[in-house]
Swiss-Prot record:
Membrane association type: Multi-pass membrane protein
Protein localization: Cell inner membrane
Protein name listed in UniProt: Fluoride-specific ion channel FluC
Binding annotation for Na(+): 78, 81
Function: Fluoride-specific ion channel. Important for reducing fluoride concentration in the cell, thus reducing its toxicity.
UniProt GO cellular component terms: plasma membrane
Amino acid sequence: MNNLLLHFFCVAVGGAIGASARFAMVLAMQSFGVRAFPFATLTVNIIGSFFLGLLLAYAEQQPVSETTRLFLGVGLLGAFTTFSTFSVEVVALASQGELLKAALHIAFNVIICIAAVFAAMMLYSTTVK
């Protein structure tokens, strides 16, 4: 298999796993009656951001193969997190007159997800050194 096909395969397999995991998270949260606020999207974005931060921190210290980076970073975590769903949820909340919820959804996703990346990188750097 040439490198390009292998890279597509890594992204596709990782993406299938990540998208399935996100779907499972949504179903799990809905089964607990969590519907008033889009916590499932927020949760997957925070978790995905944290693990992407760990991957980036690890890659700064250790060599990571292109296939691993594509499988984990682009495929699995890229499909697990979701900017498009986040965007649709913000528009839906705003359209329903839920402006505070829309604003909180934006703020939480941006601030907490960036903090999760930072926390993961700091955690990795303090535990590895």
